[in-house]
Amino acid sequence: FYPPFDGIPELKSAGRNFVKAFLDLDVENKHIIPTCGSLQGGYISQALAGNMHKNRKTILYLDPTFPVTRYQAKFLGLKAIGIDLYNYRGNKLIEEIKKHVANGKIGGILWSSPNNPSWSCLNELELKQIAEICDMNDILAIEDLAYIGMDFRKDYSVPFCKPFIPTIGKFGENWITLISASKAFSFPGPRCAISIISPHINEKKYANLKDFCEREQFGHAFSLGGLYVTTSGTSHTAQYALAKM
């Protein structure tokens, strides 16, 4: 029989516990959505970000980023622009983001942290201010925790203990966080990951999403409008394996 579009209960529960243990985020099972790798989670996230509002068809990348994410935007008919993190950090980064957001065309902001391939990491001050920008302008923050916990300047390896891995989820409401099993657990072959959807935006309704994928509520648009029409969910085998990890 087919796996549930939004994931098996075992992985949703294990994912919720993992997120609490290492990111100190409190979410429910319904906010944990297994995908066929983080790339699928990012693909659906970008599709929704570019269609939450009319005329916001641009994704802003904090570069360098995994090149395939830009190819995804092109495939989706979205415009891609970037800010090079080598040149902009701290307040300079925030001011540059604000300049791009001011044109009213940005639907989503996407980054990876630790960054693939530069290994740079956004700090909590930057994350807090990016969250404020996204919440104020109803922009979707797409956070790819690509090499999760692999910033070895701090020890993030002890569950349920500080320090916790920095995440946009501690500061904002309009976010999706992607966690890759390929990198976190050296589990690339079966193509499995989890997307954590902000409890706030999960329930939010967008008339433009209704026009785009027949689902007005954001969470339904992700699982039924995105996962169902692309891969009909993620395989049972991969989900059970990841849940055990």
Regions found by a protein language model. Name each.
Residues 1-137, 142, 148-172:
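Conserved core of the PLP fold type I
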Residues 165-245:
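Conserved core segment of the aminotransferase class I/II
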